[in-house]
């Protein structure tokens, strides 16, 4: 069986760090929304027993890549729980990468979630999305949001999701050619991890902010300059722990107009936000 799909990017419309847990992880509150832009996937299920990842330049089998980790985790769990009868289940996964790494757009997490959701279908392991999201949490905090496939306010360590409907808008997303490690940002001495936790109603009525933005502006001058430049045209802020910055527009034409006047060396794209993940729209016909 073959399945071709989009592994979508996301933006964080707001992101607050509300405390540090005893286990060292941080609690967050974030508004997580999908874009109709992302990496291109083609997954071919087979009975070779192997998980193979093909990119435009390399073939991977035994590497610490989120796609291979997700596929092997699903297979191992399904075998232990009797949802797969033998170890012959395998897959060839072809990836065309469009989402920059370390950009705050969730590329690695999206890839892991896409792998879990699609192989669950192709291998007929019959896990619910909730069950897959719990598996995904073992890979990364953003993975459950991608697995569930709805715009959501996400809390805790990524394990508490409140699906909502958010107005779909157009975004100009600009990449400053800087890769920022999530771990690096969470360990920053400048991180104030005590933003007051708010109710869902208050969160959605309060002007949106990102607790990591001031840290990024202090440590990465290009991000500071980029936010200043884009904010002169439209409401703009950083997504995730960086490095991408997005500007918000009511229509595509307005986004294109601003993109056209930016310096020619600026890298970016225009995308529409969507309340249902493009993956889930095609896979589940939502």
Curated annotation (Swiss-Prot):
ATP binds at residues 100-110. Pfam families: GHMP_kinases_C, GHMP_kinases_N. Pathway: Isoprenoid biosynthesis; isopentenyl diphosphate biosynthesis via DXP pathway; isopentenyl diphosphate from 1-deoxy-D-xylulose 5-phosphate: step 3/6. The gene is ispE. This is 4-diphosphocytidyl-2-C-methyl-D-erythritol kinase. Catalyzes the phosphorylation of the position 2 hydroxy group of 4-diphosphocytidyl-2C-methyl-D-erythritol. The active site is at residues 10, 142. Keywords: ATP-binding, Isoprene biosynthesis, Kinase, Nucleotide-binding, Transferase. It comes from the Bacteria. Its EC number is 2.7.1.148. Gene3D superfamilies: 3.30.230.10, GHMP kinase, C-terminal domain. GO terms for biological process: isopentenyl diphosphate biosynthetic process, methylerythritol 4-phosphate pathway; terpenoid biosynthetic process. The lineage of its organism: Bacteria, Pseudomonadati, Pseudomonadota, Gammaproteobacteria, Enterobacterales. One of its GO terms (molecular function) is ATP binding. Belongs to the GHMP kinase family. IspE subfamily. Homodimer. PANTHER family: 4-DIPHOSPHOCYTIDYL-2-C-METHYL-D-ERYTHRITOL KINASE, CHLOROPLASTIC (PTHR43527:SF2). It is an enzyme of class 2 (transferase). It catalyses: 4-CDP-2-C-methyl-D-erythritol + ATP = 4-CDP-2-C-methyl-D-erythritol 2-phosphate + ADP + H(+).
């Amino acid at each position: 069986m073959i399945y071709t799909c989009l592994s979508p990017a996301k933006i964080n419309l707001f992101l607050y760090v509300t405390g540090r847990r005893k286990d060292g992880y941080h609690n967050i509150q974030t508004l997580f929304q999908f874009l109709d832009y992302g990496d291109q996937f083609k997954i071919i299920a087979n009975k070779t027993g192997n998980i193979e990842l093909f990119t435009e330049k390399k073939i991977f089998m035994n590497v610490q890549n989120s796609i291979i980790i997700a596929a092997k985790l699903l297979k191992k769990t399904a075998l232990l729980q009797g949802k797969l009868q033998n170890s012959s289940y395998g897959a060839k996964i072809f990836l065309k990468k469009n989402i920059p790494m370390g950009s705050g757009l969730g590329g690695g997490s999206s890839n892991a979630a896409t792998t879990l959701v699609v192989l669950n279908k192709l291998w007929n392991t019959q896990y619910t999305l909730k069950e897959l999201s719990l598996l995904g949490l073992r890979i990364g905090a953003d993975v459950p949001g991608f697995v569930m496939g709805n715009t959501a306010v996400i809390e805790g360590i990524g394990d508490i999701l409140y699906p909502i409907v958010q107005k779909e808008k157009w975004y100009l997303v600009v990449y400053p050619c800087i890769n920022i490690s999530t771990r690096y940002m969470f360990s920053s001495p400048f991180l104030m991890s005590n933003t007051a936790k708010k109710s869902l109603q208050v969160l959605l009525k309060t002007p949106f902010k990102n607790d990591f933005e001031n840290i990024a502006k202090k440590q990465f001058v290009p991000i500071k300059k980029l936010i200043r430049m884009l904010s002169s045209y439209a409401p703009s802020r950083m997504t995730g722990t960086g490095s991408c910055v997005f500007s918000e527009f009511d229509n595509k034409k307005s986004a294109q107009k601003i993109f056209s006047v930016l310096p020619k060396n600026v890298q970016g794209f225009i995308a529409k936000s969507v309340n249902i993940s493009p993956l889930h729209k095609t896979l589940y016909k939502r």
